[in-house]
Amino acid sequence: MSPITREERLERRIQDLYANDPQFAAAKPATAITAAIERPGLPLPQIIETVMTGYADRPALAQRSVEFVTDAGTGHTTLRLLPHFETISYGELWDRISALADVLSTEQTVKPGDRVCLLGFNSVDYATIDMTLARLGAVAVPLQTSAAITQLQPIVAETQPTMIAASVDALADATELALSGQTATRVLVFDHHRQVDAHRAAVESARERLAGSAVVETLAEAIARGDVPRGASAGSAPGTDVSDDSLALLIYTSGSTGAPKGAMYPRRNVATFWRKRTWFEGGYEPSITLNFMPMSHVMGRQILYGTLCNGGTAYFVAKSDLSTLFEDLALVRPTELTFVPRVWDMVFDEFQSEVDRRLVDGADRVALEAQVKAEIRNDVLGGRYTSALTGSAPISDEMKAWVEELLDMHLVEGYGSTEAGMILIDGAIRRPAVLDYKLVDVPDLGYFLTDRPHPRGELLVKTDSLFPGYYQRAEVTADVFDADGFYRTGDIMAEVGPEQFVYLDRRNNVLKLSQGEFVTVSKLEAVFGDSPLVRQIYIYGNSARAYLLAVIVPTQEALDAVPVEELKARLGDSLQEVAKAAGLQSYEIPRDFIIETTPWTLENGLLTGIRKLARPQLKKHYGELLEQIYTDLAHGQADELRSLRQSGADAPVLVTVCRAAAALLGGSASDVQPDAHFTDLGGDSLSALSFTNLLHEIFDIEVPVGVIVSPANDLQALADYVEAARKPGSSRPTFASVHGASNGQVTEVHAGDLSLDKFIDAATLAEAPRLPAANTQVRTVLLTGATGFLGRYLALEWLERMDLVDGKLICLVRAKSDTEARARLDKTFDSGDPELLAHYRALAGDHLEVLAGDKGEADLGLDRQTWQRLADTVDLIVDPAALVNHVLPYSQLFGPNALGTAELLRLALTSKIKPYSYTSTIGVADQIPPSAFTEDADIRVISATRAVDDSYANGYSNSKWAGEVLLREAHDLCGLPVAVFRCDMILADTTWAGQLNVPDMFTRMILSLAATGIAPGSFYELAADGARQRAHYDGLPVEFIAEAISTLGAQSQDGFHTYHVMNPYDDGIGLDEFVDWLNESGCPIQRIADYGDWLQRFETALRALPDRQRHSSLLPLLHNYRQPERPVRGSIAPTDRFRAAVQEAKIGPDKDIPHVGAPIIVKYVSDLRLLGLL
C-alpha cells in the first residue's frame, strides 16, 4: 500500500472539518453568490451589495472584545483585551456602510471622485469606511502608519483629500496633515472608545487645533446620524453610476526610487479583490482569516476582501504591533495562512524558543521538535488551515522547507506587484491573469536572452489588472511601460522552463527586503560615500533577507590612522552618523560589511568605463562571500540566541541586552554599544516584538515593545529597565557576581575574586579534604572537547590506553542527544583515512561512552543520576575544552570557560579526589613579566590582577587564567592533583591522513602559499645586509602534545604541575624554511624579494581563488601579515620542567621535545589535497 501523500492528508482534513467543525462548514462559499459576483461587468458597489445582502446573517468581521478598567489611583479609564472576539454580521456591516454613506453624501462631505485619506490600522471601523468610499465612488488613499509625517504630507498635498479618516491613535498625525493640506473639511475618527480618557482627550485636542478649518467627528457619531432603513439597497446612492474605469484607489509606494508615487486603481481593478478565484487558488474552501496586513498594502486588501467575497469571517489582530499575533491566531484558528516571510520568521522563532526552553538533560531533540511543531500546528495556528501562501517578498528556500514541514502542506509562493497584480504562482506564469509576458536584455547588468543555461533578463508583463499609471505622474508612468504597452517589473528573472521563472535581481538597483521594504542601493551608496572614512562602497542585499550588507574601501587616511581590525568599529560609527544626518531608515543601514583595502579601478575590472561601480563584477567578486556572511549571521544568530536563553541571565544585564540585540538583528556583540538605539541597529516593530520575547525568556521580565522602540531609550536604558524590574539573586555564579561590576563595565579582575565558595556549595568544599584519592590505576577517564583538534587526539590516545587496562573513556560532547553526540565524535575521525577510522572504531566499540553535555552548564548539562555516576567512577579528568574566541571579552567567555572549569572541579571534589589535567594557553603570559613567567610560579602571585580590555585575545587568555586560578584554589583546599599544560601553536601530525585544524592560522598559511604559489623573500625582517635572518617558529605536532598531556597528566597523582608545551629550540627552523621544504617536495612557490610587492600580489591572488579555497585561506587574517615579523630565536617562555618531564617519561619518537621537520609541513599539502582544498 502506497503511503498517504500530503495532498491526500489535506483532503481528509478538509472532509473532517466539514463534518465536525460547525463554524468551518457554515462558512462554505455559496455557489450562487460566487457566480453572481463573477459576472463580467458587475460594478463594484453591486459586488459589495451582493456579498453583504447574500450573506447577511453570517458573521463578516470580528475584533477582540474589550473591557474598560478604571485606575483607582488616577481615575483614568483604559482598555483591557479579553480572550475572545465579537463579530458583526454582513447585514449589520451593510447597515453601517449605508448609514455612513448617507451622512457623507447628504452633507456633501464626500462626492464621487473625491479623495479620502485613511490613516490607521486595519479594523472593523477601517473596513467600514473603506467600503463606504467604494459605495460612494470616492477614491481611497490609504496612508502608511509607519511613515514619518514628512513622508505623508506630500501625498496629502498631491491628492487634496476632502476628508481624512484616522484611528484615534493616529489622530495627532492626521491633525497635522489636515492643517498642512488645508483641503480636508472633515476628520473622521475611528477605533474610538468614548469611555477611554485618552481617546476623549485626543478628540478634544484635535477639535481645538482644527477649530474653524475642519469638523472632527467620531465614526460612531456619524453613523448614528445616518438615516437609512435596515437592509436598504444601494439603489441610486451616489457612486452607483460611476464608470468602472473611474479611479477608486491610490496605493502609494514607499518612495525608494524618489518621491512616493500613487499607483492608480480603477474600480474594475479594485473589483478583482472581491473575486478571489482570479488571484488565489485556495478560494474554494471556507475563508476564516486573521487580518494583520495594513490596507496601504495590496496584500492586506486581498486578504480582507477575499474573505468577505467568500462569505467568510475576517478577524483583526488586537494590536498593530502584532504583539498579540500568536494569541489571536490561537483564538481565531484561521483556515487560510497568508503571511509575509517576516511572519513565517516569527513562527520559526517561536518554535526555536519553545524547543530551547523545554530542552532538558538527555532529551531527544528530534522528538521534542516534532512535538513542538504539532503544538504550533494545532494550538498556535489552530489546526484547521486548508491553504498557506507567502508573498510580498521572496522567502528563503530553507524557511520554505521548514514551513512546509511544519504545516504538512505545500506553501504557495505568490509573486506580483502593486502595479500589475499577481504574476507568478510558485514561479509559474499566472494564467489567465497574465495576458502576455516577455524577457528583455539588460546589457548594463550583464543579463541577456542568450545566456545559458537559461535566458535571463527583465520581466515585462501585460495583465488583466494592469494599472493605468501613477497619479499625476505622466513621465514616471511612461518610463514603466515599453512601446508595446508591457509593464516593466524591474525584476531580473531567469526563464528556467516554459512560463517558469526564478527571481534573480532588481534592475534599477532597488531591492525589496524580506519585510517588504524597498531600498535603493545607488542612493544609499551616494549617501554613505559622504563619510570621510569611505572611499568606495558597494551595497549588497538579498530579497530573502531583512537587512543589507556592504563592501567598503576605506580612504587611505582611514587605513593609515588605525589598524584594519580597529577600523571596522570606526566605519560602523561613521555609517550610523551619516545615516542619521540623511534621515535614513534603520533597514537602509548595512548590518555588516567587508573591509576591502584594494580600491576598485578600471584596471581590476570593478569600475565601468565611466567610473561607475561594475555591479555584475562586484557581485561575482564578493557575492558568495556576502552570502556566506548572511548564512553565518543566521547560524550565529541561532547559536547565540540558544546560548542567551540558556545562560544570558548569568551575565551582566547590559552585556546580555547588547548581545541579545546583536544576536536578534544579526550583528556583532562587539559592535553594539550601550548608547545605541534598537532601531538604529536595524530593528523594527516585528523584531522589537521578538526582542521583547527574548528578554522575557532570559530575565523573566516583560519589556514592552513601546519601551524598546522609544527614541528615548538606548540599550543602556533598556538594561536599566530590566535591572529595576528584575528580582535580585541568581542560582549560578556570573561574571558580575564573581568579579563585580560598575554599570556592567569591568576594567580589571583579580585572582582573589575567584574563590571556590562563589562556585561550589559549602558542603562539597567542607567534605573535600576528607575524601579518598581516586584509583592510581586510571581506568575511567572523563574527557571534554573531544571533537576539537587536540581533543580528538587525546580521545584516541586515551582509547589506546583504556584498551590496555580494559577501561572506559567517557567523552562529554555538546549535542542534542547522546546519539548525536556520538555521531559528532565519529565524524571527526572520518577524514578520508580508512585506517584511522577503523582504528578508532575498533577501540571505541569496547571502551568509549559519549554523553551529550557541556562543561559550561550546571551539572555539565547531565541528569543528576549520570552526574553522580561520573562523580563515583571517574579516575581522571582531562579538560582541553574551551570556547576559543580571540574577540569576545572575558565577561562572555566566563561562563563556558571559567565557570565550566568550576563545574568540572565540583565533579573532581565529589565522592573522591580526581586528578585534573587542564589545557591552558601560553597566551596567559601576555600580562606577566617574562622573568616571572615560569613553570613553577603560582599564577595567583605572578598574575594577581589582570586588565580587561578589547585587545586581541584578552578575553580568551583571561578566561584560561581564571581556570588556572580555580585549580590552584582547589589544590590548596584538598591537595587536588593538577597538571596544567600551556600550549602554543598545535601543528598537524604525520600519521593520520586528512586530520587538519583547517580554520587555524597555520593551516590557512600553508593552503594560501600552495594555492597562490608565491611567498616573500623572507617572512622576517631582513638583516642589515639584506640577508635572511635566523628565526624559529614555535609549534609542536598534535600527536606529541596529546601523548605528553596524557602521560604527564596520568602521572600527576599529587602536587600541582605546570608545563609550557612549547618548542624551545634556537634551531633556525621558521616560516622561510617551511617554504623551502614545500618547494623541495614539488610544490612550486615563487619568492618575491620585496615584502610589500609580495603582499599586494598575494592578496590579489587570494581574492581570485575559488570560493572554497578563498574561504579557508589567510585572507581574513591577512592584517597580521602587513609587516614582516621580528625574528625570534627559541621559545618566549622557559620550558625546562616540560622538557625534563618529557625526557624522563620518554615521550614521543625522540624521547624529547621534537623539532618541526619537513614531513609535517609537506603533509599539510597532501592533507589539503585529500580534503579537496588544493
From Swiss-Prot:
GO terms for molecular function: ATP binding; long-chain fatty acid-CoA ligase activity; NADP binding; oxidoreductase activity, acting on the aldehyde or oxo group of donors, NAD or NADP as acceptor; phosphopantetheine binding. Its cofactor is pantetheine 4'-phosphate. Displays in vitro half-lives of 73, 70, and 48 hours at 26, 30, and 37 degrees Celsius, respectively, indicating it is a relatively stable enzyme. It comes from Mycobacterium marinum (strain ATCC BAA-535 / M). This is Carboxylic acid reductase. InterPro entries: ACP-like_sf (IPR036736), AMP-binding_CS (IPR020845), AMP-dep_synth/lig_dom (IPR000873), ANL_N_sf (IPR042099), CAR (IPR046407), Far_NAD-bd (IPR013120), NAD(P)-bd_dom_sf (IPR036291), PKS_PP-bd (IPR020806). AMP binds at H297, S392, E413, G414, T418, D491, Y503, L504, D505, R506, K512, K612. NADP(+) binds at residues 787-791, 814, 824, 854-855, 880-882, 919-920, 956, 960. Pfam families: AMP-binding, NAD_binding_4, PP-binding. This enzyme can be applied to the microbial production of fatty alkanes and fatty alcohols that have numerous applications as fuels, fragrances, emollients, plasticizers, thickeners, and detergents. Thus, together with complementing enzymes, the broad substrate specificity and kinetic characteristics of Car opens the road for direct and tailored enzyme-catalyzed conversion of lipids into user-ready chemical commodities. Residues 651-726 form the Carrier domain. The gene is car.
